[in-house]
């Protein structure tokens, strides 16, 4: 899963990609091609 600042280009990678809001975060999910998954701006673990 990629961590991106903006999901605008991520949702246009594949026609099946869709944006979902879960627990206050925005995710891009793609059931037909799971390598296109992305999340918007998550805090990095240290």
UniProtKB/Swiss-Prot annotation:
Keywords: Ribonucleoprotein, Ribosomal protein, Stress response
Domain of life: Bacteria
GO cellular component, one term: ribonucleoprotein complex
Induction profile: Expressed during stationary phase in minimal glucose medium, induced by EDTA, strongly repressed on shifting from minimal glucose to minimal glycerol medium (at protein level). Induced under zinc-limiting conditions in stationary phase; repressed by the zinc uptake regulatory protein Zur.
Any one biological process term the GO annotation gives: translation
Annotated SUPFAM superfamilies: Ribosomal protein L36
Record-level Gene Ontology MF annotations: structural constituent of ribosome
UniProt xrefs under NCBIfam families: PRK00831.1, rpmJ_bact
Protein name: Large ribosomal subunit protein bL36B
Organism: Escherichia coli (strain K12)
Phylogenetic lineage: Bacteria, Pseudomonadati, Pseudomonadota, Gammaproteobacteria, Enterobacterales
